[in-house]
């Protein structure tokens, strides 16, 4: 049982017969007494720290130096991790609400849970498991589900976007009564995938709703259940058929905000309300307790009868952030490696060092499409104000307007998957295909008054 722990910790735990997942009581030098499940130690960290799962769901680390005694309270009784449909309550008659929603699992915190009886981490994504974990879904929709991937979101590639778009198209064509598709996804690159579906799935009978979780389902502060409820409400009730993200709108469990995939960005590493609409407002707001949806706009792509999917993406596109002292060799590298498109995150209104302009000009001359977005995130590129911007335009750089850099990257990847014609590439990139570009910037689209 000592895997990951030091010999001193092993000696202490072995002396009382304690093993992983046994219930133990630990008395500390300051008189504090803690009870919980003895957990394996993470791969990284101090081997002299004992990890305990408290009854409130949180894990804590206890330094060996603070421990006075360990008492074994209850031995772990091993059992196999439940297979889909075997969990308690999974055979319950959930009733047959009229709407039907299809869940697609791709991995991430939202689509897995920890079984602390076995210690195993495994996907929960059958309809029965979703109902068991989130009973409120029973009154909202009939759930069908399928796991397409089980990967970390940072491992997503344009090839995965292609497979996901094809799967969503297949679901809408095959399941004529499905009101919407909910995609469970890791949060770190969720906005990339949501933007990709906005371009690839061009017509659909219902929305594609991306949902994730900042906190795992075994934590008391988990946002998973409420986010899934909100996403389901959107899939059932939204009048639009767009690719959107449904996540917490505040740190409280009161509101789910619905962001267009092409306008959303993860703006915090860990807050439950990490996602924000950039240069735009959320398209809708959900009250997850009432199961109601309130639209914030009258302009959207409505539900239709057809399913149109153009799923090809190019993997020869890069997103490059400019920084002071950046070497021209970086652009030369992409040219040598055969890249067909480059989105530069420039400073301010869309600038890079004048020392880079010749390299950029060479990229364009060799047939590489080069676009400019701003690393400011909010606001829009305007390369006609300063000489550097004007020189970049003369070199052939195409401004990305007020597109988020990540969206510009995804859009260019999708465009280069459709055509190699330079004029068509530029026409598509500068066109507003999925509400990713605004004609003008609105004053209240910047959250400067949040403090």
From Swiss-Prot:
Active-site residues per Swiss-Prot or TrEMBL entry: 109, 187, 188, 266
Positions of region (Disordered): 78-97
InterPro entries tied to this protein: AsnA_fam, Asp/glu_Ase-like_sf, Asparaginase/glutaminase-like, Asparaginase/glutaminase_AS2, Asparaginase_C, GatD, GatD_N, GatD_N_sf
Spans through the membrane: none
EC number: 6.3.5.-
GO terms under biological process: amino acid metabolic process; regulation of translational fidelity; translation
Protein name as annotated: Glutamyl-tRNA(Gln) amidotransferase subunit D
Catalytic reactions on record: L-glutamyl-tRNA(Gln) + L-glutamine + ATP + H2O = L-glutaminyl-tRNA(Gln) + L-glutamate + ADP + phosphate + H(+)
NCBIfam families named in the record: asnASE_I (TIGR00519), gatD_arch (TIGR02153), PRK04183.1 (NF003217)
Protein's organism: Thermofilum pendens (strain DSM 2475 / Hrk 5)
An example Gene Ontology molecular-function term: ATP binding
Family classification: Belongs to the asparaginase 1 family. GatD subfamily.
Asparaginase/glutaminase domain segment(s): 99-432
Keywords assigned by UniProt, alphabetized: ATP-binding, Ligase, Nucleotide-binding, Protein biosynthesis
Functional note: Allows the formation of correctly charged Gln-tRNA(Gln) through the transamidation of misacylated Glu-tRNA(Gln) in organisms which lack glutaminyl-tRNA synthetase. The reaction takes place in the presence of glutamine and ATP through an activated gamma-phospho-Glu-tRNA(Gln). The GatDE system is specific for glutamate and does not act on aspartate.
Gene that encodes the chain: gatD
Subunit structure: Heterodimer of GatD and GatE.
Origin: domain of life: Archaea
